[in-house]
Swiss-Prot record:
UniProt-recorded name of the protein: CDAN1-interacting nuclease 1
Effect on the protein of changing residue 20 to R: In CDAN1B; uncertain significance
One cellular component term from this protein's GO annotations in UniProt: cytoplasm
Coiled coil start-end: none
Modified residues (Phosphothreonine): 114
Any Pfam family matching the protein: TPD
Gene source species: Homo sapiens (Human)
Major location category of this protein: nucleus
Encoding gene (name): CDIN1
Compartmental location: Nucleus; Cytoplasm
Length: 281
């Protein structure tokens, strides 16, 4: 789904100060029924992550952490089964999984002889049954499963979706009888920064030569696209020549402005591929 900047801004404006909940996403879908669920979820997640980055510091002051911890302790004393941490995260407008991490770190600092390592914290967040306090384990679990944008569950889902779309792209390339090298093959050849697929025989798409294709299982907004241009796409262009980026969940139309310079954007696999007869050196 390709959106104009104005269409994107309208959706983003609706996300100001809404909690990262499934209920919020359902309301967004009702407000924009013509947009796909996947596109809205991607925009929803990206906008919320921008918000968290802007407000992250205020939640990490020693005063804030101590206040949250005492509120957690008071809450579970009254009712340990109630979603105390989840409600607290929503009240102070902080991602539930990140709130769970804060409280878990504070709890372990108080109850363990040595400060907990990052790997231990991550392991406990992935598997809350490892947390030595049953009440806190349940509170952390509630935060993890109810967070739409952060946490180990979301990370696993994003990784799986990304892999799924890479497999889809591979199948489409094979279906078109296009020869290619994938990321693993390129790294075996010594390349450190590579696109998902290098075409061994270049193709033309809408009059533009394509040497490589990158799959992105997300929506291409200004922030993410400019970061990708800087960190990935221009490096690919410099090393391998012009290429194609597929944002499977759409992108802002105005961002497709580098076609003449060698980076083409699409929201699906192109159907009008013309195979060229010479191969990459």
């Amino acid at each position: 789904m390709i959106l104009t900047k104005a269409q994107y801004d309208e959706i983003a404006q609706c996300l100001v100060s809404v909690p990262p909940t499934r209920q919020s996403l359902r309301k967004l879908k009702q407000r924009f029924p013509s947009q796909s669920q996947a596109t809205l979820l991607s925009i929803f997640s990206q906008e919320y992550q921008k918000h968290i980055k802007r407000t992250h510091a205020k939640h990490h002051t020693s005063e804030a952490i101590e206040s949250y911890y005492q509120r957690y302790l008071n809450g579970v004393v009254k009712n340990g089964a109630a979603p105390v941490l989840l409600d607290l995260a929503n009240e102070v407008d902080y991602a539930p999984s990140l709130m769970a991490r804060l409280i878990l770190e504070r709890f372990l600092q108080e109850h363990e002889e040595t400060p907990p390592s990052k790997s231990i914290i991550n392991s406990m967040l992935r598997d809350p049954s490892q947390i030595p306090d049953g009440v806190l384990a349940n509170q952390v679990y509630q935060c993890i499963v109810n967070d739409c944008c952060y946490g180990p569950l979301v990370d696993c889902i994003k990784h799986a979706i990304g892999h799924e779309h890479e497999v889809l792209l591979r199948d489409l390339l094979l279906e078109k009888n296009l020869s290619f090298l994938d990321e693993d093959q390129l790294r075996a050849k010594g390349y450190d920064k590579t696109p998902d697929f290098i075409l061994q025989v270049p193709v033309a798409v809408e009059g533009h030569i394509i040497h490589w294709i990158e799959s992105k299982a997300s929506f291409g907004d200004e922030c993410s696209h400019h970061a990708y241009l800087h960190d990935q796409f221009w490096s690919y262009w410099n090393r391998f020549g012009p290429g194609l980026v597929i944002y499977w969940y759409g992108f802002i139309q105005e961002l497709d402005c580098n076609r003449e310079r060698g980076i083409l954007l699409k929201a699906c696999f192109p159907t009008n591929i013309v195979t060229l007869c010479h191969s990459i050196a």
